Regions:
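Juxtamembrane helix-entry segments on the extracytoplasmic side of multipass membrane proteins
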Residues: 2-6, 79-104, 141-162
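Specific transmembrane alpha-helical segments of multi-pass solute transporters/efflux pumps
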Residues: 1-35, 39-40, 76, 164-169
Length: 169
């Protein structure tokens, strides 16, 4: 079953593990945490939009209302209802690249709903992570050629544990 649908699972792995995680961690080097959180909170809007464009799921008024209320709630919580914080936000390189990461995750989420899976949730997760990891390998070699080196120490393994485990949950 996996081999019959490998292209589908490969796209899921690339859009989630490879692109989304890489871009989000890269973007957070250049933007403020508040900007990142606000931008990531718009992912449900993007999922609905992409699902609608790809004709995966029809959007109804209640979904739009729910996402709108959710987004407003997130903005109010993060800014502590001080809208001056929003006015003073400056968009930078990190914000712009973060948008591509969010679009990648929204695409992954929409495509995940497209197909009825015959795999258990754990197997699906393993397959998606495996494909995503395979496509991270070339990125590693590119970074290595540029001069970035991984130091195999305790800090590296703690970061690796966090990056591998938590985003996929």
């Amino acid at each position: 079953y996996i081999l019959e649908n490998y292209k589908y699972y490969m796209v899921l792995g690339i859009t989630s593990v490879t692109i989304f995680n890489s871009i989000v961690y890269y973007s957070l080097n250049f933007t403020q945490v508040i900007s990142g959180v606000l931008m990531i909170s718009t992912i449900p809007v993007m999922i609905i939009f992409i699902s609608s464009i790809l004709k995966i799921e029809k959007t109804n008024t209640f979904q739009i209302l729910g996402v709108t209320c959710s987004f407003i709630g997130v903005v109010l919580i993060i800014t502590k209802a001080n809208l001056g914080i929003l006015i003073n936000l400056d968009f930078n390189k990190g914000d712009i690249t973060m948008v591509f990461g969010m679009l990648s995750w929204a695409t992954y989420s929409a495509l995940l709903k497209k197909k009825k899976h015959e795999l258990s949730q754990l197997t699906l997760l393993e397959v998606v992570i495996s494909f995503g990891f395979i496509f991270l390998i070339p990125i590693y070699f590119i970074e290595y050629q540029v001069g970035y080196r991984i130091v195999l120490n305790q800090n590296f393994f703690m970061i690796l544990f966090y990056v591998v485990l938590f985003p996929g949950l």
